[in-house]
Amino acid sequence: FNLLVKLNQRNPEVQNYHFDTIRFWVDEFDIDGIRLDAADVLDFDFMRGLRRVANEVKPEFWLMGEVIHGDYSRWANPEMLHSVTNYELHKGLWSGHNDHNYFEIAHTMRRLQGLCHDTRLYNFSDNHDVERLPNKLRNRDHIRHIALLVYTLWGIPSIYYGSEFGIEGKKEWGSDWPLRPCLELTDYTDAEKTNPVTSIYAALGSLKAECPELSWGEFKELTLTTQSYAYARVLDGKAIVAVYNNGDSPVSMEFQLPVEASGVEDLL
């Protein structure tokens, strides 16, 4: 990151300047959190200091960092950041569908749970730095599969503006600007009724708000093949089960429900 300003993050004056900045924004504007760009080059003790100040000024204040590679628990833990960008899952979401290989997504979830435990990572399908899903998927119908995964896997779902409309965005000549277009919302007034991508995002947003299982429920894998995947989010004797088929024809799946039940309900 040669273009970034180099600050001595161990200098007390530098630290206090940033600590006071958090205090100012909370006192003046009651902000709820900040995103730390390129958090993987920040000093760990500096981030510990940020967390201490955040806890002091507003217990629910949220610190999220941009981290691409590595063991995410080094940055996201009870002493430093609350969460980091989940690029590892992001890669599996689109390539796992292109390759018809749900093992990639399942393996990623197992690995991240082993490393990060209860920490909820910042899950996304696309953002301002990566090409949008319609330009990466071989089958654009899989956009809806990925939306469901982002909302129901363990973590915090993040929707990049325009993704709820399924817009395209491909890097050109090394520039990210095609990923960041200006949208006129008046062009999408009826999108929830006419656009299947928008309708699934709207339904998932409502489901997330109504069902605490999707925020706090234990994640349990139920069955897995290259083309089919099922898991549950379980909380207080209730379970939400998500079932996927990335193939071109129907499949049959058998698995044990994670809770006792007399029936099931289709939530979407």
Residue ranges and their predicted role:
Residues 33-35, 62-65, 122-124, 151-152, ...:
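Structural recognition of the beta-strand scaffold that forms the well-ordered cores
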Residues 1-9, 178-181:
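Aromatic- and acidic-residue-enriched carbohydrate-binding clefts of CAZyme catalytic domains
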Residues 27, 37-121, 140, 149, ...:
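Active-site-proximal helices and loops of the catalytic beta/alpha 8
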Residues 10-28, 142-147:
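Short, acidic/polar
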